[in-house]
Amino acid sequence: MKSHQFSTALCQNTTESNGQPLRFPSPAKLNLFLYINGKFPNGYHELQTLFQFLDFGDWLDISIREQDNQIVLTPEIPNLKTENNLIYRAAKLLQEKANIQLGANIHLDKILPMGGGVGGGSSNAATALVSLNYLWQANLSIDELAKLGLTLGADVPIFVHGHAAFAEGVGEKITYCEPAEKWFVILKPDDSISTAVIFQDPNLPRNTPKKSLAQLLSEPYKNDCEKVVINHYSNVEKALNWLLQYAPARLTGTGACVFAEFDHEAEAQAVFRQKPEAFFGFVAKGLNVSPLHAMLKQLSSTHTHRQSKPEVL
């Protein structure tokens, strides 16, 4: 499969041109571990999970519309009204919050699988918020953007913050951390997972003891949803069993994606070349700093450098 790793592409993508769209990365994520500690009276589950970004994902091509305040989003997604799209909703939220009179043209280059548990929709929403905050010069803080993002989805603030994080509660308590940046083979089985079905299953563990982050990082990582998911979805079980032949492997989130971890890229690529054709998949490196935030840091640095150049007389 064609590589869409951000690290090589970003080097050529940090020059701003008037009227021309900029390409902003919208990275995937993995839940390196996921434990369910209990259930709140409101029905939400209490979790402990570790998020890490991947050097792989979608792209959003964004340009400012100065002639009006319209949000023009392409392409259309079948069976999804534009006003219900998370990208569109994120842009409108930011417009209203910061009283922005400008608009935007946004094109989604969709690469990540739908319903894979790698955060595609949440990442798209966060990239829209963070990128438009920069382009429109809305000047909202990361915390303000994260609060907006939380109204769109529980995982959106993680992508807005842009750093690998340990999340607790229902995901609202976030602690930045630095897990090892390993290489991963990620497979997407041909199953569409119902998160509601998984969390309503009576066999789902709901009493895993809470532990400190230090203790969790020192132990083998697990996902409490994994056994229930493979009991419901045979293709997930097949993909997981295939990966387990080569390396430690597990489910991310509630799936359907599964992943195996490797210390070196060559090992991951060698396994990926043997992948059964039935599975969509890719190889990516784990990143503790989001490629989106790395790009914005480069853009800000370039802009500051240009402003500080002496005039030539």
From Swiss-Prot:
The protein's annotated pathway: Isoprenoid biosynthesis; isopentenyl diphosphate biosynthesis via DXP pathway; isopentenyl diphosphate from 1-deoxy-D-xylulose 5-phosphate: step 3/6
Annotated positions binding ATP: 113-123
GO terms of biological process kind: isopentenyl diphosphate biosynthetic process, methylerythritol 4-phosphate pathway; terpenoid biosynthetic process
Keywords of this entry: ATP-binding, Isoprene biosynthesis, Kinase, Nucleotide-binding, Transferase
Transmembrane segments annotated in the record for this chain: none
Active site: 29, 155
Uppermost EC category: transferase
Entry EC number(s): 2.7.1.148
Pfam families noted in UniProt: GHMP_kinases_C, GHMP_kinases_N
GO molecular function: 4-(cytidine 5'-diphospho)-2-C-methyl-D-erythritol kinase activity; ATP binding
Disulfide-bonded cysteines: none
Chain's role: Catalyzes the phosphorylation of the position 2 hydroxy group of 4-diphosphocytidyl-2C-methyl-D-erythritol.
Family per similarity comment: Belongs to the GHMP kinase family. IspE subfamily.
HAMAP family: IspE
Protein name as it appears in the record: 4-diphosphocytidyl-2-C-methyl-D-erythritol kinase
Native source species: Haemophilus influenzae (strain ATCC 51907 / DSM 11121 / KW20 / Rd)
